[in-house]
Structure formats: structure tokens, C-alpha cells
């Protein structure tokens, strides 16, 4: 087996909100071996004991917001800080991501290859898989949509969009494409950015031979027709619906995707409401999300989690 080279000038960023201490510490410990700096943006204060342990990592820079500003603000703050500090690439993670040692250098080699082939890569992601030992159906890994008319290169596949977690970004391209939409707060931020990158002549890639364990939601909801969806908290379902509907007015979001969502969203709404027994606490955020998406009202959701 060939030895991996020293890491390229790469930083890592994590956006957290009341994280599981053990998972976050494992993530920081793994990343500290492969990157020059770790930026941790906290949307809520950390427990003092966790802060004390994190202080032992000299490469970690922690920033805590006064209130929950959302994932988009955290991602942008991290990207700007890494750019200011001279890093060329940035890998972004959720607080419960589970990369393995050496994963980022391996993605870096693949990124180098795509750049050498002049494929204009903006982002490259590992393939997210359910954590080992999880009961079947406890988490739904994302489905990746291969980009039509764009040939793969071995295990590297061009895809329409990527989840943020584990994804390696070219910071120059990120700045040129534009930062993440902070007004989305959470949900569909990565999807909108990837569609924007494609519209500007850049590309997004999946390294299908590089798995990374990651949990999406708190179980799955059957929708019929062989379809399932992740079970999320009601406010998350509301922001997902809001941001998806708002995306219909964006020219860089493909028409085919919009038409597919027109068919899929009603199925998701009914399946989510039925799963939660049509309780007002579940249906209310969905209705507000639909209303706000149609009206173009974005920002911090009124029923979002407090700090």
C-alpha cells in the first residue's frame, strides 16, 4: 500500500449545537492528525468540561455565538476564517460526523487528480453511510444523483449536489461562487450551493470508494412506493419545506429538480404528518414553512430551537 503524502494546506470546520461530547471529541481527535487547523463554530455554549478538554488541542480555534445563528452563518464564518489564515482547501463537518484517520489526505489526492484533469472541482465528498451497528432503518444515507452528461473518472462521480458533512471545498472557488446562504438557517444550504456552483461552470464530485459514517435524522419514515425519508424534528421539516419552496424561484436550480420536488413534497408532508399522528406540534411548523417559502420569508425560523 502506498504511503499517503503530508496533508495539503487544508483546514477543517465544524458547526455545533449542543453536541454529544464523546462524538465531538472523537471528531476533533481524528481531524487534528490530518489538518493544519480546526475551526469549531458553536451555536450554543459548550459544557465547561468539554471546553476544558478541547483547550488541549492547539490547532483548534473555537468561536461561540451569543445566540443560535444557524448552520449557514457558522459555515461562512469558518470559510472566511480559513481564507484569512491562508488555507487553500476546507473540509466541513457536522458535529456527529465520523471521518477516519487519513480520509482527508485521500480526498486531497482525488481533488488533485480532478484539478489536473481540468474538471473544475468545487467540492469533493466521501460517500456517507449509516454507522456500523445501527439497526436497519435507524438512519437513511443520502442518495446521490449523478450529473447528466458529465462522465465519471473511476470511483469519482460528478453529482448534482453533496451533503456538507465531510465535503472538501476549494476555498477560492467557494468565494467566487458565493458563500452559503445564511438566510436558509439550516437545511438545503448545501443543495442550493452545489446547484449554484454547477451553474457557474464548476463541478461537485463524490468519491464513492471513500465511505464516512454519518447519522441523518432520528430514524426513517416510510412513504410508500419503496420510498423513505429521514425523521427530523418538526422545526427542521418546516425549514426544509420553506427553503425547498424558495428554491423554486432561483434560476440556477434546475427545472427537472423543481418538477421532481413538486411530486415528492406532498408525499413527504403527508408521510411526516401521519408518522407524528397529525399532531399540531408537527403539522404547525410544516404549514408555517410552506407559507414562508411561498412568501419568500427566510431567516431564523420562529419555532427554531433556542440557544
Where are these regions (language model features)?
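A short, conserved alpha-helix in the catalytic core of glycosyltransferases
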Residues: 167, 173-178, 183-210
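Short, well-formed alpha-helical segments that are part of the catalytic scaffolds
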Residues: 14-33
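Non-catalytic, C-terminal membrane-associated alpha-helical segments of glycosyltransferases
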Residues: 249-307
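Short, flexible, basic/aromatic active-site loop/helix in glycosyltransferases
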Residues: 140-160
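A conserved acidic beta->alpha catalytic loop
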Residues: 42-50, 67, 97-98
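Short beta-strand-to-loop acidic/aromatic patch adjacent to the donor-nucleotide binding site
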Residues: 87-98
Amino acid at each position: 500500500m502506498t504511503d499517503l503524502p503530508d496533508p495539503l494546506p487544508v483546514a477543517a470546520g465544524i458547526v455545533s449545537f449542543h453536541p454529544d461530547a464523546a462524538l465531538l471529541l472523537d471528531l476533533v481527535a481524528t481531524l487534528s492528525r490530518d489538518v493544519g487547523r480546526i475551526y469549531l463554530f458553536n451555536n450554543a455554549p459548550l459544557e465547561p468540561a468539554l471546553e476544558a478538554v478541547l483547550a488541549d488541542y492547539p490547532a483548534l480555534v473555537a468561536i461561540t455565538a451569543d445566540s443560535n445563528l444557524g448552520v449557514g452563518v457558522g459555515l461562512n464564518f469558518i470559510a472566511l476564517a480559513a481564507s484569512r489564515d491562508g488555507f487553500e482547501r476546507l473540509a466541513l463537518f457536522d458535529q456527529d460526523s465520523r471521518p477516519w484517520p487519513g480520509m482527508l489526505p485521500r480526498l486531497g489526492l482525488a481533488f488533485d487528480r480532478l484539478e489536473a484533469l481540468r474538471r473544475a472541482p468545487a467540492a469533493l465528498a466521501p460517500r456517507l453511510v449509516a454507522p456500523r451497528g445501527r439497526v436497519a432503518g435507524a438512519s437513511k444515507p443520502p442518495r446521490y444523483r449523478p450529473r447528466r452528461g458529465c462522465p465519471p473518472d473511476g470511483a469519482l462521480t460528478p453529482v448534482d449536489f453533496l451533503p456538507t458533512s465531510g465535503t472538501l471545498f476549494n476555498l477560492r472557488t467557494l468565494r467566487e461562487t458565493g458563500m452559503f446562504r445564511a438566510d436558509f438557517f439550516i437545511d438545503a444550504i448545501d443543495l442550493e450551493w452545489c446547484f449554484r456552483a454547477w451553474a457557474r461552470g464548476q463541478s461537485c464530485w463524490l468519491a464513492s470508494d471513500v465511505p464516512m459514517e454519518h447519522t441523518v435524522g432520528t430514524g426513517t419514515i416510510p412513504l410508500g412506493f419503496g420510498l423513505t425519508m429521514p425523521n427530523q424534528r418538526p422545526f427542521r421539516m418546516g425549514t426544509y419545506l420553506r427553503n425547498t419552496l424558495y428554491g423554486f424561484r432561483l434560476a440556477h436550480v434546475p427545472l427537472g429538480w423543481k418538477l421532481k420536488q413538486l411530486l415528492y413534497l406532498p408525499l413527504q408532508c403527508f408521510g411526516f404528518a401521519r408518522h407524528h399522528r397529525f399532531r399540531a406540534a408537527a403539522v404547525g411548523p410544516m404549514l408555517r414553512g410552506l407559507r414562508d417559502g411561498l412568501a419568500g420569508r427566510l431567516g431564523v425560523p420562529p419555532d427554531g430551537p433556542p440557544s
